[in-house]
Amino acid sequence: MEGGEELFRVSSARLSSSNVWRNSAMDVFSRSSREADDEEALKWAALEKLPTYLRIRRGILTEEEGQSREVDITKLDLVERRNLLERLIKITDEDNEKFLLKLKERIDRVGLDLPTIEVRFEHLSVDAEARVGSRALPTVFNFTVNILEDFLNYLHILPNRKQPLPILHDVSGIIKPGRMTLLLGPPSSGKTTLLLALAGKLDKDLKVSGRVTYNGHDMNEFVAQRSSAYISQYDLHIGEMTVRETLAFSARCQGVGAKYEILAELSRREKEANIKPDPDVDIFMKAAWNEGQEANVVTDYTLKILGLEICADTIVGDEMIPGISGGQRKRLTTGEMMVGPARALFMDEISTGLDSSTTYQIVNSIRQSIHILQGTAVISLLQPAPETYDLFDDIILLSDGQIVYQGPRENVLEFFEYMGFICPERKGVADFLQEVTSRKDQEQYWARREESYKFITVREFSEAFQAFHIGRKLGDELAVPFDKSKSHPAALTTKRYGVSKKELLKACTAREYLLMKRNSFVYIFKMIQLTLMASITMTLFLRTEMHRNTTIDGAVFLGALFYALIMIMFNGFSELALSIMKLPSFYKHRDLLFFPPWAYALPTWILKIPITLVEVAIWVCMTYYVIGFEADVGRFFKQLLLLICVNQMASGLFRLMGALGRNIIVANTFGSFVLLTVLVMGGFVLSRDDVKKWWIWGYWISPMMYAQNAIAVNEFLGKSWAHVPPNSTSTETLGVSFLKSRGIFPDARWYWIGAGALIGYVFLFNFLFAVALAYLNPFGKPQAVLSEETVAERNASKRGEVIELSSLGKSSSEKGNDVRRSASSRSMSSRVGSITAADLSKRRGMILPFEPLSITFDDIRYAVDMPQEMKAQGFTEDRLELLRGVSGAFRPGVLTALMGVSGAGKTTLMDVLAGRKTGGYIDGTISISGYPKQQETFARIAGYCEQTDIHSPHVTVYESLQFSAWLRLPREVDTATRKMFIEEVMELIELIPLRDALVGLPGVNGLSTEQRKRLTVAVELVANPSIIFMDEPTSGLDARAAAIVMRTVRNTVDTGRTVVCTIHQPSIDIFDAFDELLLLKRGGEEIYVGPLGRQSSHLIKYFEGIDGVPKIKDGYNPATWMLEITSVAQEGALGNDFTELYKNSELYRRNKALIKELSVPASCSKDLYFPTKYSQSFFTQCMACFWKQHWSYWRNPPYTAVRIMFTFFIALMFGTIFWDLGSRRERQQDLLNAIGSMYIAVLFLGVQNATTVQPVIAIERTVFYRERAAGMYSAMPYAFGQVMIELPYLFLQTIIYGVIVYAMIGFEWTVAKFFWYLFFMYFTLLYFTLYGMMTVAVTPNHSIAAIISSAFYAVWNLFCGFIVPKTRMPVWWRWYYYICPISWTLYGLIASQFGDIQDRLDTNETVEQFIENFFDFKHDFVGYVALILVGISVLFLFIFAFSIKTFNFQKR
């Protein structure tokens, strides 16, 4: 049975104790108990008579008053479910185990067996392929070469140059049911790959050998993804859903597995044996194990034991929407799989961001469920505290892809003693295990003093384990195959989905409807935008201005119709972004087999139809009669129907683009390309008669062509157009002759052909959307990248050699003395603070001197305006105080820990001291070495390592440090000294092996979390600061990584700097590395400020001296103990106020005296003074910003290379579509075709540039906020660098486009005309790109920037002078024509090309006259137009720079 699968859950909510009989003062026994029992017995008897199907859907529910009634369990409401759980599990820690035992007892009583799964893996090897060294960096050059190389490899023309990268190497083992297995190993040891292999979820691109079996069955005999559950370390959720909704959706999709059958069998056997179960357990099991319920008791149970009840109805949130905390999100990821029926759980790093007590409670709940209900679990944890480690039965230790140990927890230390290594007393066993295989850390644990130490490789450990008694026993067990006949029939699932397809479609539809309600702002905004655009269009094409006398009048009407098509089509563009935003969670659910892709695709289409109806109705009702289209109700409704089809077709097309592109930049580029083809081939820009024969297929497949034909026929075959023009030579009506002149079929049936074709496209695009969802995988999978050093080191460690790594930046004599042990990105840890005295003296004499400074602060208070939500809850104060009178002193060479529970104000205090707060009210005094703190000078001598490691993604580690040092070290420091100093810092922070590694985006590519943390520290250190603040430098790291970072921090302190760290949950050895502690309690009050002492002796002595505080247990972590005894609950229980106790202590008086002493400047000292605000001159700042942007652009091929390729393809496409049209000047239509080519190119290339630059600027802006706060440069040099780097790329874009198109379209080859063509194209692309930058600079994020900019494109398009020439615009709108940038571009392009040509057209006017009469463009005005375009570019540049300088959207 999948019995209790939902019971594998977890907890953190501690509720007040009591059991069901103590829950109220009401007398439950007000009637005689016999009477109540008799009544209940009668109800049970009645229930027993029902057939099994009905019996397992009904139960006896006890009310709050103690009365019982029969209920249908599928209709329990939230309150009833909550009361039921309250009775079963009052306090999670205490009652969950009792409840599970009751459940198991009920099953055992009738002799039912629960299904169990034993997972075996034999000789499992997994290999990937990786590029090595600089070829792995994603530069524009490598990007192009790699595409060619992969293509030639595919054709077997070139050999594969990628290096094999072994991830797992010949591992074997058994995971037994009913036992908890802990998976440990340093980073990059293959933990995630092993878990994915066991869960049957390995990537298809990996080479896999060996086999994984469940109960002896191979993976192809059952559905592994549903028999087991893999819980990823990445938290991918839909931000707009609440926690409860997320879990309920998951439970609804996964179903109950075989539990329904087991429940039926249990009920049948109980009836036969005449056993009456506990009514509460009975109702819980029936409610949890019945199929197809939307609101399930399992969801409530999971929320309870995971401690998520407090945020059950809070939105999950994402980077744009505030929601639950990181720790709660992590628990939600765990809960999402636990509500399902899987019997085997593979959990990857489920404790990141959780404090140790929450982790303990969650693991303990899982353990209870695994032990009692015989589940199978493998859990990998980063930093398990000793008490959590002790919950496990078995340990698997992985290192370098090999198993070093697998077996009972009790024997693991015995194995390492057998190898000669002993775990020290004050060291967590888990931390010891992660370090003992590492080259850097192994020696300190060597216990055989009589023998000389020699590094023992992972392979040697692995071979020794085979000979160890545990290893031999494992080998013997593997030699005997699993007896398949013993496998429970319900253990392995063979059905692909958890519930029926109909039920899954209902679940997806309900969720999509919910998301549409939550995203209603987008739809309302689109309707407002459409209403606004309709108002402008109405007044521009006002019927009083619209005549029906000539074909030119027809052109204006056609312009209005074409614009309506464009507006309705582009209104669906938001679908593209909305689709891509939901893709990460979709891929997760799809791969976990929650639902088939079509069940997701169908609701996203069907539910949008009503919105389409409303949007199109708004447009048609507002514009149809006001513009003066054919006054016929039938034609009105036909236009309405047609535009509905267009909107649906466009939405389907954009969704398809999103599903094909899967990345916002690629999808935008790709989407623009398709749209361009659809529009150019639509028949308005280029008439059918002029389409080249090699492109005519494009005309016939363009949906826009069918829309254009149908909407034109609907209008021009009406009565108003049925007259013959007065001086016409033919007998054709005006409508027919106009349609013919534009290459449109003048046949009424074309309306229905067009509408039918559009409906066909609606179905086609939505079908292809579902297909793309089914078969494509997430975009940009993390690429394996190897440095040459890593390859050399891997090979050496296999042979058991020790190698020397690049000792760059050292003199030859120093290289000789300094025999470095090998270090790589994976083996970098040693005991925290393990620096020898010789090292220390060397470190203190770093190349650049600095002035040691102390910082003192007295009575610091910080408050913010009271949030509206709190005022609504009845808080009357105007301000909410977050810090209340905090005082202290931080001194050089002393490492201070800033600690407290979540919400105590640790980061707030740090931000206040560092001057990083952007709002709020600050009181109190802060002094630097006795002088009052001045923020301008302080920023020059202080470093601040933020918790979020924000760095430019496309530069290398060395370049990041170079940039920081260049801008922050004083001008006097020459280049050679600066480089030596950077090398020293890299040596200190152990970054030398990573010098050429790309930083990358967190969680996507580049550096690991721990390497990022060290880079953050190094970036601040190269500024040579005297004071460094670090916010949570070890959160999210495993024990070894945390030790590396803390050793880095300790090394920094030992150079004589003042360092302060906020820290969340330190292990014993990390806590021991600190010298002093400032402890805050919730509410921002201090409760201990002072030295820690050896092994925290001073801290322990202080707290144990307080009455009622329990003594610390031997070997217990002092940090954990201290947080437990000072918690709010503990403070209440003791009746103490720790703040008052501290303020009345001797310690407080000593601190006050120290603050007073350090607040007076030393006699020979002087206040900090710098002649300028920034270290470097304005010119140097500009050059540095330009240098960084150069590398950022060069290594960002999805932006730069794709843009150049896009331009190249567009140029070829335009050249072939408009082939030789520039030289034809017989008819007006010839000129309009050539002008159409200019119009569409300007619009598309421009909008494409503006759209793709936005995400790039948005990512760089977050880095800019950090760098500006650090005092590196002012806003102007940043804006300069950002704009200057665009110029060469724009020039390349213009040359590629200009030369190809100019030659192919056949414009006149004179130097002046060619120069003007390139000039106008260059400045047009420039102002569009600057416009994209500007919109990001004035908005908080790039989504809002995209919405705002797209609103303007629509207006610019309307007023550019192509759809409606200036001469036909009403007087009241002409002013907008003059401020529309595109109108000046078209003026320049058209007037410079055609404004001086004297050839005569078929209408007997010259080209020059036609251009002047139709557009009002004059050739001699071209020079002024050029100046206007330069002016527009300068204006946008100025707004961008001004906004970047003035607006700060980062709130702290």
From Swiss-Prot:
Any Gene Ontology CC annotation: plasma membrane
Residue intervals passing through the bilayer: 521-541, 554-574, 609-629, 640-660, 664-684, 694-714, 753-773, 1199-1219, 1239-1259, 1287-1307, 1314-1334, 1344-1364, 1375-1395, 1421-1441
Pfam families: ABC2_membrane, ABC2_membrane_7, ABC_tran, ABC_trans_N, PDR_assoc
Segments of skewed composition (Basic and acidic residues): 812-821
Gene ablation phenotype (knockout): Enhanced branching phenotype. Defective in strigolactone exudation from roots, and reduced symbiotic interactions with arbuscular mycorrhizal fungi (AMF).
InterPro entries recorded: AAA+_ATPase (IPR003593), ABC2_TM (IPR013525), ABC_trans_N (IPR029481), ABC_transporter-like_ATP-bd (IPR003439), ABCG_dom (IPR043926), ABCG_PDR_1 (IPR034001), ABCG_PDR_2 (IPR034003), P-loop_NTPase (IPR027417)
Keywords, sorted A to Z: ATP-binding, Cell membrane, Membrane, Nucleotide-binding, Repeat, Transmembrane, Transmembrane helix, Transport
Domain ABC transporter: 152-425, 855-1107
Localization terms from the record: Cell membrane
Membrane topology listed for this record: Multi-pass membrane protein
GO terms of biological process kind: hormone transport; regulation of secondary shoot formation
Binding of ATP, residues: 185-192, 900-907
Induction of the gene: Induced in roots by auxin, phosphate starvation, treatment with the synthetic strigolactone analog GR24, and colonization by the arbuscular mycorrhizal fungus Glomus intraradices.
Region: Disordered, residue numbers: 808-830
Domain of life according to the entry: Eukaryota
GO molecular function: ABC-type transporter activity; ATP binding; ATP hydrolysis activity
Domain ABC transmembrane type-2: 504-716, 1180-1394
Tissues in which the protein is found: Expressed in root hypodermal passage cells. Expressed in stem tissues, particularly the vasculature and nodes adjacent to leaf axils.
PANTHER family, per database record: PLEIOTROPIC DRUG RESISTANCE PROTEIN 1-LIKE, PLEIOTROPIC DRUG RESISTANCE PROTEIN 1-LIKE ISOFORM X1
Task performed by this protein: Cellular strigolactone (SL) transporter required for the exudation of SL from the root to the soil. The presence of SL in the vicinity of the roots is required for development of symbiotic interactions with arbuscular mycorrhizal fungi (AMF). Transports SL in the above ground tissues and is required for the control of shoot branching. SL regulates plant shoot architecture by inhibiting the outgrowth of axillary buds. Involved in the regulation of shootward and outward directional strigolactone transport in roots.
Homology family: Belongs to the ABC transporter superfamily. ABCG family. PDR (TC 3.A.1.205) subfamily.
Protein name: Pleiotropic drug resistance protein 1
Annotated organism of origin: Petunia axillaris
Annotated gene: PDR1
